[in-house]
Every structure is written in structure tokens, then in C-alpha cells.
A protein has these predicted regions:
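N-terminal edge beta-strand
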Residues: 23-41
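Membrane-proximal low-complexity regions enriched in glycine and acidic/polar residues
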Residues: 78, 82-177, 181
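Short, aromatic-rich amphipathic segments at membrane interfaces
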Residues: 175, 196-229
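Juxtamembrane interface at the cytosolic side of transmembrane helices
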Residues: 235-256
Length: 256
């Protein structure tokens, strides 16, 4: 990866002074654009690097957004000494993964109004409760959603994690956790000057399953009925086998 990095870095530096670069103002690349998830997947660390037509005091913000969809927040209560889920709220159009990185504090780069308009920040995401669900204290549910996603490492804010060099080069490491969802991930690089957007570029990362986990996933998606029947039969066989072993062990104890 180091060899590829240096080759791409030389390429980026070579176009830094070209007319093409002057028009685009920012170019970026990833050390890995395809991530394969196998049964022993422990996460991935991807290097993002690039060049920009910068000046002293410029800033770079990197936003990585995974597939969006429905995310459920559940409330647990203790009933008769047992914790059970008593209520739930579904949020739609919610990023299943979100990482926001910057070269310094985001509040020092953009004011609150600009952050809200640009959806930069976990509290500025334009997600909403699924229609038809009545929610009391929605603010608390939204806080619980954020707390859950942060705890599971699916959302993160990484300030001071983008390294700038000579107002022309930048790099940052993107970390995907072991529980990351599959799909297309958008990598948006934003170049700011005096709190105003100067240029941007969008790259992408494809996360997919491989090996036996991919086969199981494909069967579950394409043959859901068959997969359900197989899961039930497997559970019955496991239960029957466990019961048989228990009987033999118990009989041996009695004989002894």
C-alpha cells in the first residue's frame, strides 16, 4: 500500500500546478475502494489522501455516509425483575454509518447556522420519525438514537484527524467497524476558506460480503422463505441433539 500511496502522491503533486487542477481545485483518492466482509472481518482502515489549491487557514472536512434506511430505537423497562423492550420508535432516511472528520474543531470552521444547513454534525441530520407513529418527548428518542449509534461505532465525530501539509496536501484515515453494513458509501471531501465552501469532491467505497457469509446473505435475501424454513429446522435439530446428549449424560450419572 505504501508503494501505491507514493505513486498516487507523486501524481497529485504533479497536477497541483496544472491548469486542470486549478479548475477543479481539489483531487483525492483512497487506498482501498472495495471492502470485503468475511466471517473473521475485524474492520477496515482506509487512507484518504489528496491535494487542494489551498491558502493558509483553509480547512478540510471529510464526511463518509453509508446506506440510509430505517433504524429502530427501543426503550427497555424492568418488569418483574426482567428487562424487556416496552416501546420503540422507527427513524427513516437514517445513515447506517456516518463519520465526520476535520483538521480542527468544526465549530471553529463553520458557524452553527452553516452546520445545520449543510447537515454537518450529528444533531443536524435531516432524519425523521416514521409516519404514523406518535412520539412523546421526541428529543429524548433522538438523543437515544445518537447515543446508540455512537456506542456501536457506526457514527463518529473525528475532529483534528485530517492532516494538512503546506496548504496543498491532506490525508486522513477512515475507519469502518466490524459491524458495518454492506452497500455503497459516499466519501465527500469539503474544502473551506474563511467558512465558505471553495470546492468539493465525492469518492465512494463499496462494502460487500465474501465467502460463506456472502452465500448465507444471498440466500437470506433471495430465498427468504427457504432460509426461514432451514433456520427453523436447524433450531429443531440443535434442540433435539442437545436433549439427546443431556439424556445420555444424565443416564451415565445415574448408572454411576
Amino acid at each position: 500500500m505504501k508503494v501505491c500511496f507514493h505513486i498516487n502522491l507523486i501524481f497529485l503533486v504533479s497536477i497541483l500546478s496544472s491548469n486542470t487542477f486549478a479548475q477543479n481545485q481539489i483531487v483525492a483518492d483512497l487506498s482501498q475502494e472495495n471492502v470485503k466482509i468475511s466471517t473473521d472481518f475485524q474492520g477496515a482502515k482506509i487512507l484518504l489522501f489528496g491535494a487542494y489549491d489551498g491558502k493558509k487557514g483553509d480547512d478540510i472536512i471529510v464526511i463518509v455516509t453509508g446506506p440510509k434506511g430505517l433504524v429502530t430505537v427501543q426503550k427497555k423497562e424492568k418488569i418483574l425483575g426482567v428487562w424487556v423492550n416496552t416501546r420503540k420508535v422507527n427513524y427513516i432516511n437514517t445513515p447506517k454509518y456516518l463519520s465526520i472528520s476535520s483538521n480542527r474543531r468544526i465549530d471553529d470552521i463553520l458557524n452553527k447556522k452553516t452546520q445545520k444547513i449543510s447537515e454537518i454534525g450529528l444533531n443536524n441530520l435531516k432524519i425523521r420519525v416514521q409516519p404514523g407513529i406518535k412520539v412523546e418527548n421526541e428529543k429524548q428518542w433522538r438523543q437515544a438514537l445518537t447515543r446508540n449509534m455512537l456506542k456501536s461505532n457506526l457514527w463518529s465525530i473525528n475532529e483534528n484527524s485530517v492532516t494538512l501539509n503546506k496548504d496543498s496536501l491532506f490525508r486522513s484515515y477512515l475507519k469502518l467497524p466490524s459491524n458495518v453494513i454492506t452497500g455503497q458509501f459516499e466519501v465527500k471531501i469539503l474544502h473551506y476558506r474563511n467558512s465558505k465552501l471553495v470546492s468539493q469532491q465525492i469518492n465512494s467505497i463499496n462494502v460487500s460480503k465474501s465467502g460463506i457469509s456472502a452465500e448465507i446473505y444471498n440466500i437470506a435475501q433471495n430465498y427468504s422463505t427457504l432460509y426461514g424454513i432451514f433456520a427453523v429446522l436447524l433450531a429443531v435439530l440443535v434442540g433435539w441433539g442437545s436433549n439427546l446428549i443431556f439424556r445420555k449424560v444424565w443416564r451415565g450419572i445415574n448408572d454411576w
